[in-house]
């Protein structure tokens, strides 16, 4: 019997220890005579009162691989939790997954608390003058709360998992150690439904079959149970990607049967309330794109809520959501401390506005502008913003436009800029705009900005941004056009692109890298999430640098 999903494999008993030879005849009676009573123990002063031998020095039992993997003497090892520092050999830092090697999800199975790239990251920040770099290892197993899984195989033996490295062969991963336990339980239920109802998994070569993919998204938002129980009792939003144009297609009857099976066995009336809601997505394309454009809500609650950074956030199945809920909350908690109270904030590449809304609620900002190119994020933003306190006193807007088109429009009037770009990093136009907000070029930017205001009506990108804008709070705030960003907060999921962008920003002498933190968003991989804080060089500092340069030239 296999171990329950999400748990370590049961150790197999050693047969050599359990098996003893059976004698053909009883041993001679002389060997079974009771031995004589042992003599009394020696006097206490001979042994008992002697002090026990001192324990071996700690240096003789170093945690295996801890010091070689951690950078020395950077601060990267300092913030690691005490249990990691003292018990690095503990199995808690090992993957212990039966699927490792077949599944492409994890690239290493030991030292999950120290991604291989960590030493390079710590060295980079040390070279650039960051003395308080920290690394948050987070939860090392059962951390993934969102998963997109391919479905292949046969009704009798469905394969639900990820593609093997470099192929389109699906590795079945029913006991994935990264998945939240509720995801593994929901996958098990789905597998049972596929077999019992004879659902045909998708055949990628022939383009036939019925069920192509499934997305599992866990919500831990449940105010009816204690806070410390909410994560482990998370419920799953199930999104089935069906190989048809819509719910009126020929095979739609099977889809309805599968949905009823899942809801009956995992819904609120089942013995274990596992499933939060069920959605269907209809996709007939032969490309590698997972989702089609048509979504249908079929069972359960329509809105999936999660608590991020102190605010309630609504996420549709088509919205982007962080896979590691706990680590993302840790990042938001750290980020908010770097936003001065009363700031005017612009959040570029904002998605559904999670970061902007969190900052608005926790830092009493005067205004927050969220800029996002994906129009599908608008509905999630509106729902989330509707739950903010009514007395917030902050003007919050969401703009559906491309931040890379004349980004100076968004930088002007903002004291804090937050950027959370995709893995490729910042657009060149955004980097250029951030470089040019140095104090020496304020006048040029003021003139350009004033000209832009006169030509608003002739610039369709501004009109589109205004039409798509969402205004949450009409509190009047006088934003001075004299304000330019003093703080830049950069969140990065791509280390190589961040290094390039960071060097571009600090080489211009307009920005100084002051703080940096890393988060273990994807244990078992070589990925790392970066939170970096840049400060614009002060006017006094800039003048001092120029004087020193002139003096050196003389």
Task: Name what the model sees in each region.
Residues 130-154, 211, 219-220:
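Composition-driven low-complexity segments enriched in polar/acidic and proline residues
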Residues 152, 216, 223-243, 312-316:
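Short, aliphatic-rich beta-strand segments
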Residues 8, 82-84, 225-227, 246-554:
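Rossmann-like S-adenosyl-L-methionine
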Residues 22-28, 36-43, 50-58, 63:
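Intrinsically disordered, low-complexity proline-rich regions
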Residues 1-24, 36, 44:
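N-terminal chloroplast transit peptides
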Residues 169-222, 242-286:
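Internal alpha/beta scaffold segment
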Residues 157-161:
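Short aromatic-glycine-enriched beta-strand elements
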Residues 78-119, 141-142:
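Cysteine-cluster motifs in flexible loop/terminal segments that predominantly coordinate metals
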């Amino acid at each position: 019997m296999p171990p329950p999903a999400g748990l370590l494999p049961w150790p197999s008993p050693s047969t050599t220890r359990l098996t003893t030879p059976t004698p053909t005849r009883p041993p001679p009676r002389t060997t079974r005579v009771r031995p004589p009573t042992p003599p009394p123990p020696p006097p206490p002063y001979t042994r008992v009162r002697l002090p026990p031998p001192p324990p071996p020095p700690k240096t003789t039992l170093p945690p295996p691989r801890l010091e070689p993997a951690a950078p020395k003497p950077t601060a990267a090892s300092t913030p690691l939790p005490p249990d990691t520092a003292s018990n690095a050999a503990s199995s808690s830092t090992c993957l212990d997954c039966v699927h490792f090697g077949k599944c492409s999800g994890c690239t290493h199975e030991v030292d999950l608390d120290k991604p291989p790239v960590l030493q390079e990251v710590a060295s980079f920040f040390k070279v650039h003058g960051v003395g308080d770099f920290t690394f948050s290892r987070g939860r090392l197993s059962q951390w993934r709360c969102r998963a997109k899984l391919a479905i292949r195989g046969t009704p009798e033996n469905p394969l639900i998992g990820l593609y093997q490295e470099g192929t389109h062969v699906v590795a079945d991963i029913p006991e994935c150690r990264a998945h939240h336990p509720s995801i593994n339980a929901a996958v098990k239920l789905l597998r049972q439904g596929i077999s019992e109802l004879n659902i045909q998994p998708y055949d990628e070569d022939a383009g036939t079959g019925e069920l192509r993919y499934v997305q599992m998204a866990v919500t831990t938002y449940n105010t009816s149970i204690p806070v410390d129980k909410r994560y482990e009792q998370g419920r799953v939003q199930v999104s089935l990607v069906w190989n048809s144009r819509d719910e009126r297609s020929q095979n739609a009857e099977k889809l309805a049967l599968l949905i009823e099976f899942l809801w009956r066995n995992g819904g609120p009336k089942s013995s274990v309330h596992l499933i939060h809601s069920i959605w269907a997505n209809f996709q007939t394309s032969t490309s590698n794109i997972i989702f089609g454009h048509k979504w249908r809500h079929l069972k359960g609650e329509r809105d999936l809520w999660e608590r991020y950074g102190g605010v309630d956030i609504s996420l549709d199945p088509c919205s982007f959501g962080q896979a590691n809920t706990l680590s993302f909350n840790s990042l938001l908690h750290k980020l908010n401390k770097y936003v001065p109270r009363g700031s005017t904030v612009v959040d570029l590449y904002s998605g559904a506005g999670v970061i902007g809304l969190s900052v608005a609620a926790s830092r009493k900002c005067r205004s927050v502008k969220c800029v996002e190119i994906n129009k599908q994020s608008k509905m999630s933003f509106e729902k989330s913003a509707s739950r903010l306190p009514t007395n917030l006193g902050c003007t919050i807007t969401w703009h559906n436009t491309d931040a890379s088109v004349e980004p100076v429009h968004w930088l002007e009037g903002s004291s804090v800029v937050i950027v959370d770009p995709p893995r490729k990093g910042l657009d060149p136009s955004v980097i250029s705009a951030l470089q040019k907000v140095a104090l020496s070029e304020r006048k040029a930017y003021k003139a350009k900005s004033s000209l832009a205001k006169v030509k608003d009506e002739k610039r369709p990108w501004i009109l589109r941004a205004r039409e798509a804008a969402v205004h949450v709070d009409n509190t009047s705030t006088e934003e001075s056009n004299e304000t330019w960003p003093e703080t830049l907060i950069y969140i990065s999921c791509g280390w190589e692109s961040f290094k390039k962008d960071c060097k571009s920003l600090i080489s211009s002498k307009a920005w100084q890298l002051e703080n940096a933190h890393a988060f273990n968003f994807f244990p078992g991989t070589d990925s790392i999430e970066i939170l970096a804080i840049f400060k614009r060089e002060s006017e006094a500092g800039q003048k001092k640098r120029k004087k020193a340069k002139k003096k050196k030239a003389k």
